[in-house]
Amino acid sequence: MRQNFKFKIMFDGTRYFGWEHQPNTDLTIQGKIETVLQRMVSSEKVPEVIGCGRTDAGVHAKAMIANAFLDTDMSTDAIRDYMNRYLPDDICILEVKEAAERFHSRYKAVGKTYCYTCYTGPLKPVFVRKYVYYIEETPDIVKMEEAAKLLMGVHDYASFCSNPKMKKSTVREVDSIQITKKGQYIRFTYHGTGFLQHMVRILTGTLLEVGFGKRDVSSIPELFEAKDRSLAGFTAPASGLCMMQVDYN
C-alpha cells in the first residue's frame, strides 16, 4: 500500500555535497537515502525523498526531516532498521512515522533551529575540527549579543543571502539568536520561520566581525536597507553549522 512516511535523519555532512542531488556525484544525503529505499521496495523507479530544506556541502544535521511515498507493507520500525543497515555510517535514520497524505516536509515546516559552533584557543581542535569553525582569539560576546538583537525580527535579509538571482521574497522572521560560551566553545543558536541560502553562516560571519571589532553594532540596520550581499559579513565555514530541529503544527 502506498503510504507517505516521515523521516527524522541525523548525518555528518563532512564528505557530502549537501542534501540535494548534484550532477556528476552520488555523494549527497538525498541520493544515499533514495538508493537504499529503492532497494528496499524493489522498484525500478527511485522513490523521491523530499527534504525540509537544502543543506549545503559540509553542513550537519541532528534532526533533518524528510518525507517519501513508499509502496510497502513494512512497519515503520522495520523501515528504519533496514535503512540503517544499508546506509553509510555517517547517516542515521532516527525515526520513521506514517504521515498524512498532504504532509510535505518542506512546505509544512513552520520553523527551524540551527546551531553554529566556534572553537577558540591557541591550539587546533584536532578531534572536533569537522564540526566547528576554529578561531584563535575570543570575540566580544557582549557586542555580538547587542548586534544579534538588531538582527532579529521580520526583515528583508537580502544582504544575508548568497543567491543574487533569488526571485522569491527574501523577507524572513528570525525570532531568536542566542549566543553562549562554554569553555572554548561559542555557540550561536538561531530560530526562525525559514532561512535563505547561506543565511545562517552569513549572520554568524557578521556577528563575528562585530565581535572582533571589524564592524560597528550601529551598522547592522543599514544592511537591511542596502539589500547588498557585499556589505554583510563573511560566510562562516560550513563545518560549524548543524540543523537542530524542524517545527510543524
Tell what function each PLM region has.
Residues 1-249:
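Structured-RNA-binding interfaces characteristic of tRNA pseudouridine synthases
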